[in-house]
């Protein structure tokens, strides 16, 4: 395969990956869990995915263990959880 063909194939595969709908990507396994609002010493602004509203909402993460349904930004939350 020539280098030009290989470059074209690589470009097409990259385009295909970018056009793949988010719904076909694997969701974070904890997205359906409620946010862990246990009060610990931390008051860390975070976002959790609300599956009923299909959006990410802000909450105060205490910093103690918790589950995976807490993200630093709403963009990360939506990227990992939105269907």
UniProtKB/Swiss-Prot annotation:
Q: Could you tell me which SMART domains the record lists for this protein?
A: KU
Where would you find this protein in the cell? Answer: Secreted
Under Gene3D superfamilies, the record lists: Pancreatic trypsin inhibitor Kunitz domain (4.10.410.10)
Q: In which tissues is it expressed?
A: Expressed by the venom gland.
* Intrachain disulfide bonds: 31-81, 40-64, 56-77
* This protein's UniProt keywords: Disulfide bond, Neurotoxin, Presynaptic neurotoxin, Secreted, Signal, Toxin
Give me the Gene Ontology terms describing cellular component.
extracellular region
UniProt keyword annotation of NADP present:
no
Limits of the BPTI/Kunitz inhibitor domain:
31-81
Q: Where does the signal sequence lie?
A: 1-24
> Any idea what job this protein has?
Beta-bungarotoxin is a presynaptic neurotoxin of the venom. The B chain is homologous to venom basic protease inhibitors but has no protease inhibitor activity and is non-toxic.
Q: What is this protein identified as?
A: Kunitz-type serine protease inhibitor homolog beta-bungarotoxin B chain
The organism encoding this protein is Bungarus flaviceps flaviceps (Red-headed krait)
């Amino acid at each position: 395969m020539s280098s030009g063909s290989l470059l074209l194939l690589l470009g097409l595969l990259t385009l295909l990956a970018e056009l793949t709908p988010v719904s076909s990507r694997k969701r974070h396994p904890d997205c359906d869990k409620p946010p862990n609002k246990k009060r610990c010493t931390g008051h860390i602004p975070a976002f959790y995915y609300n599956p009923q509203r299909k959006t990410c909402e802000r909450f105060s993460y205490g910093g103690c263990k918790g589950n995976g349904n807490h993200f630093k930004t709403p963009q990360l939350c939506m990227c990992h959880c939105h269907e």
